[in-house]
Structure formats: structure tokens, C-alpha cells
Amino acid sequence: MPSYAVLGATGNTGRAIVQVLLDRADTDTRIHICAYCRSKEKLFRVCPAAETSKSLSVFQGRLDDDSLIDECLRGTDAVFLVVAIVDNMPGCTVAMQTAEAVVASLQRLRATDPAIRLPRLVILSSASLEPTFCNDVPAPVHWVLKTAVSHLYRDLAAAEAYLRAQSDWLSATFVKPGGLVHDQARGHKVCLDRAQTPLSFLDLAAGMVEVADADDGRYHMRSVSVVPASRVAIFPWDGVYYTFTGLLFHFCPWTYRFLGEYKLQSRKERDKQA
């Protein structure tokens, strides 16, 4: 049966993927979803259908819980790496930590069963990391947008390089959308040469599921985008706020301690993870 793991199931993209898969499970009972998150209660709050679905299993814990992540990934056909944060946190390593945890888990599973069929990895990234996807964006605007998310993009680029280095035994696709908004699904298209802003999280999720279902190797180690099939009416106004704060955190990273969304790690905590 088709089986999917969603790492970061309570985030904006993760919950949208869970919802898209649950909608499909209504008509295809073979589908199984493994939702990995830090809080089961939050998952049920942001995606109420998950609480009663027989097609979904919740794996609650941290990414450094080896046995839990092994259990979550075992037997899946595709894994969505969508753990993310919303602002430009200095020293962010969320994408890299997720990539390392998944690679380590798949290595353990392969060591236990050398004949195991490994899942395809579908990784959330950004169009700003693929210059050809942003050809229609004026250079000054692109510079501002890229600088406002500089710490996150550095993390995403490092994770992508790390995963590409595993191409001899892993299959991965890097999904790089434009600006995202909370809006209804309007239809989507997987695109190889451009991105488009705005794009709804639900359309992004549907596109990522389409990529995950492509088992013919067409997206192996490729960068793709998802574009809306029709114009999205909602403008990403919250992006304006995050652009201003992101620029502040880029040029004055010390201000994040007072204005950022998340708690900064201490040097001791970073050294412990390394």
C-alpha cells in the first residue's frame, strides 16, 4: 500500500501535506500516513481529521530519537522533509539536522536489511536557491528577499549539498516554490524551470505528493517548483513583516534574542549537537 512519512507534520507545509493525503485516503484506503511531530496535541488541533483517521499513525518525539524515526520511516514509499521555521533565525540548522537524521535512519535500516527498498525523499526548499526559477524577479528585489532569509537559506543549501552527496544510494527531489500563502487549493503544476508567487500551501502540498508518487526516476536529484494553475487572490502580507525582521536579523543578528520567534541555542547546546 502507498505509505508516506511527513517529518514536520504540524508546520504549514506539513499539515497541508497531511490534509492532502487524508483527502486521498477517503477514496483510497490503502494509503497510510506516518506523521512525525513534537506534539500530537498540536497536530490534532491544526488538522482535526488526523485524530480520527485510521489511515494515519502519529510518531511524537524529537528527530534525535533513533528508534522512533526508524519506526516511522520503515516501509514507507516517500518521506517529506518539511521541518521548518518561519523567520530568519541566526545559526539555524533545522534543515541540516533533519537531513542528517533521515540519512542516519536509512543507513540503519539498510544495515539491518540490505535488500530493503528505500523511500524517495521530497525536500522543501526555496526558489531563491535556484537562480533560473527567479529570472522574472528584478535583481534588487531578489537580493532583498534572499538577504531577509539568509540564515535559513544557508541551512537549506548545506542540507541540499549533503543529500546530493548521497545520490549513489538515495533518491531525493528538492521542491523550491515561490512565496507561500494560506489559501484554498486552486490546482497546481510541477514545473522544472520557474517558480511563481503567491502559491497556496495546499497546492504546494499536492505538488509535493505528485513528485513523491513519480516512481520512474524523472525527478531523481532534481530541483523542481510547484506553480498555481490559476491566479491566487491572497497576497502574502505576512511576508512583508518577515522581510523587514529578516533583514534586521541578517545585519544585526543579536536582535533575534529579543524579537525572534524561537529560542536561540547556546554555544554549549550547539557544540553538544555537533
From Swiss-Prot:
The EC number(s) this enzyme carries: 1.-.-.-
Induction: The genes forming the sterigmatocystin biosynthesis cluster are co-regulated and induced on oatmeal porridge or the fungal isolates were grown either on oatmeal porridge or in YEC medium (0.2% yeast extract, 5.0% corn steep liquor). Expression is positively regulated by the cluster-specific transcription factor aflR that binds the palindromic sequence 5'-TCG(N5)CGA-3'found in the promoter.
GO biological process, one term: sterigmatocystin biosynthetic process
GO molecular function list: monooxygenase activity
UniProt superkingdom: Eukaryota
Entry keywords, A to Z: Monooxygenase, Oxidoreductase
Pfam families reported in the protein's UniProt record: NAD_binding_10
Pathway participation: Mycotoxin biosynthesis; sterigmatocystin biosynthesis
Positions in coiled-coil regions: none
InterPro entries: NAD(P)-bd_dom, NAD(P)-bd_dom_sf
Enzyme class: oxidoreductase
Record function comment: Oxidoreductase; part of the gene cluster that mediates the biosynthesis of sterigmatocystin (ST), a polyketide-derived furanocoumarin which is part of the most toxic and carcinogenic compounds among the known mycotoxins. The first step in the biosynthesis of sterigmatocystin is the production of hexanoate by the fatty acid synthase (FAS) units stcJ and stcK. The polyketide backbone is assembled by the non-reducing polyketide synthase stcA by condensation of the starter hexanoyl-CoA and 7 malonyl-CoA extender units followed by cyclization and release of norsolorinic acid.
Cited PANTHER family: FLAVIN REDUCTASE-RELATED, UPF0659 PROTEIN YMR090W
Family: Belongs to the avfA family.
Protein name per UniProt: Oxidoreductase stcQ
Organism: Emericella nidulans (strain FGSC A4 / ATCC 38163 / CBS 112.46 / NRRL 194 / M139)
